[in-house]
């Protein structure tokens, strides 16, 4: 069941849902449940905290059974929380102290909840002031508190106005609470109990002077209390809690409330309420089944009607499609007839134009034939025939073709010569680069070994030899050394290097044998260490067993001690009433301690956040540098591959 509440930040305390019937709400009942809660916390079984709570001495529960409880703050959970370290309770065990310290650390390490409401906005202040003013008037603030109220009171309040309004709003939530301490302590403590989400923006010094710049924060707090009151009123109404469509939940909640009231009245027989709930369930179930049958019958009838209408709809759609097709054909025929009619009027003009063009063409043909006869007469006078003219034209075409072939072959030869020259230049350049690499390698090798005195460097005899001599050159004419002699010298030098390598390998084998001996000694030492560790683990297991038995004995003894202390505490509750004042002082000191601890943890969390931001920025800077270095490395590697490919091609 989904229930929509008006405010998400308002605490929905289960104790607020109780009916004030005046029964089983005394201080004695609260003390009894708190004692039982302590029994459960100290390790006893949970079954002892139910209806078996009557095992406690009836004399300790006789005080105030008929009176009402003083406040919602006197509920068992609150008594157990507010009197954790009082003199009326036994000292806490180690498990209790650890659990409470964890709860305190969780509470103090809660993040700072910043108020997002525009409390400094004048329009927003006017709106919430109007709502607070309307709520106070509707709930008869002036009659109950005997204090005047105007709209100006919420704009420029005095300290007394704030105190009276706060007391009125809180008493609407908890009618039995009485304000006995100073207003600074009361306001801060009550807001902390109500889980006010923006308590971090309020401190004790501001509570003593609410006017001026501090008033918007306190106005927002009063508005939150008004909304909390409205939500409590909505919780008391059944209509808001249960949706109108969910009758089963209404019946079940009615059964729960009646059973709970019987439990409050100390009656254990719930059969009457159960039978009533069962009969109402059966009646409602039968009604729902009947409604389902009626709806199914109506659904079948509607389905039949739908099928009939669907068949008629298919016939109608087919007829509409046919009519649309006929309309389209009619439109096309009309368009075709119109085009043919328009062409009829144009055919006469077209025929006249064609006849005129035929006459013009015949005149031009006669003119061309007369010109042809004139040309033939002129050629006959020169002594040439048309065949002679054709032969001359064919010879001219042959000569032009032969000239073109010769010019093309000349261009091809030029291209071949140019390509050969380019290849020769490239080969010369590659040879020059190869000699440079060879000289560099020889230089590096000779730096490492000075025993062999021979200059292996090879150079060209003349750098301009290719440009000056077009004839073919032998290898010895290009470089300054004989390659065969140079090869012999290189082989001799290689043999010297191989002998040195073998000497170093022998030395390496000797060193490896020494390393193997040392590693064997290390393995023996490790085996000894493993045996000692096995003995240590065995000793640890025996120690753990002894330690567990000792802890079990101590827990049993501590449980017996706690049981005796609880008995002693129950006696002190009835005899030592004078310790209550000391308890109240201790509670005040404890509250101040919690506040100081909360401030320390909040400052610590702020420092942790700052350190985390610094670390994140440092990591981001480092990652950026690494990515840039990787990009630079990839770029250098690509350039190296390109150069290597060029050298391999050459």
From Swiss-Prot:
It is found in: Nucleus; Chromosome, Centromere, Kinetochore. GO terms for cellular component: Ndc80 complex; nucleus. The keyword Transmembrane helix does not apply. Residues 43-119 are annotated as: Disordered. GO terms for molecular function: microtubule binding. Residues 50-65 have a biased composition (Polar residues). Residues 85-111 have a biased composition (Low complexity). Acts as a component of the essential kinetochore-associated NDC80 complex, which is required for chromosome segregation and spindle checkpoint activity. Belongs to the NDC80/HEC1 family. Component of the NDC80 complex, which consists of NDC80, NUF2, SPC24 and SPC25. This is Probable kinetochore protein NDC80. It comes from Debaryomyces hansenii (strain ATCC 36239 / CBS 767 / BCRC 21394 / JCM 1990 / NBRC 0083 / IGC 2968) (Yeast). The gene is NDC80.
